[in-house]
Amino acid sequence: MSYARGEKIDGVIFLVEETDDGYTARALGHSIFTQAGSLEELKEMVKDAVECHFEEGERPKLSDFT
């Protein structure tokens, strides 16, 4: 998936996997990866990773894990 700088992104899908040490989250179509020891911690790490990856006007709204 590609987008032009300044273009608003509707959403990002993350593949979440359980590991021996906790959980990992990898964005599909974007170069975003993070990991954490718990799901609650992972939610915060995903939020932080998205904020770092996208500029202010491009960031998608984040919804809860389902």
Curated annotation (Swiss-Prot):
Source superkingdom: Archaea
InterPro entries according to UniProt: TTHA1013/TTHA0281-like
Family: Belongs to the UPF0150 family.
Protein name: UPF0150 protein AF_0072.1
